[in-house]
Amino acid sequence: GVSIDDNTQGLHRLMAGAQYCQPLNKNFLDAKLMPTLYYQYKKKGYNLHFGAVPYRKLMHTLPEFYLSDSINYAHPNLYGALVQITGKRGFLELYCDWYGLQSRTTREAFQLMVDGEFRAKVFYAGGYISLTHLANKAAPEPRLGVCEKFSVNPLVGINLSPITPLDSFTVQAGYILGYNRERETATQHISHGVHADIYLQWRFLALRNNFFYGNN
């Protein structure tokens, strides 16, 4: 990549690369390279990304009910914009992932996500709010309907890393509410549940355990 760092104007960076994806149960001829190309601007608590931005640029790894490891493997970048605002007590983050550009072969699809965190000593509170939109292919392809999914996930946790010999030790719990709507059939579905997570890391060893109780 190429970067220009100015104490007055901030950091400007243009990054380019590629990620190799080998589909499971396929031969090497079916593998594909997915380009990574984005512009970054960073200054005094603001960090902006535009383009094909790796998910690892997010402040935290997304929970698996938002982005499972299998989806992340095949879809390693978000395509759109990522805005991050950081301060001494926490952060606020917003992104738009436009992963389906409407055409005769592709349905229009995008996801909006807002997440944040507020910290007070070893305690923290935050959460996620997301909206996913799936629409039709371009005309004259037949209509397949328009689907929308909204979810909210408030959570609280404790970071015990500073008072233990571990590099990372966090425990958190939260509630997730999901609402799905299918416009074509005028149907809707509401699901909800509680979850708890524990994460421990010491050097190159890590352990993560997730618990969920609720409905799909």
Model-based region annotation:
Residues G1, L29-P35, H75-A81, T106-L112, ...:
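Residues that define the transmembrane beta-barrel architecture of outer-membrane proteins
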Residues H49-E117, L131-H133:
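Surface-exposed coil loops of outer-membrane beta-barrel proteins
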Residues G87-F91, Y99, T105, M113-A120, ...:
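Exposed, low-structure sequence patches enriched in small/polar residues
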Residues G1-Y41:
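Beta-barrel outer-membrane channel/assembly domains of diderm bacteria
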Residues C21, V53-Y55, I176:
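Short glycine-rich beta-strand segments
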Residues G45-N47:
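Gram-negative (and chloroplast) outer-membrane scaffold detector with strong preference
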Residues H12-G17, H49, N153, G157:
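A generic structural signal for ordered secondary structure
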Residues Y41-K43, I85, L200:
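Active-site beta-strand termini and strand-to-loop segments that position acidic
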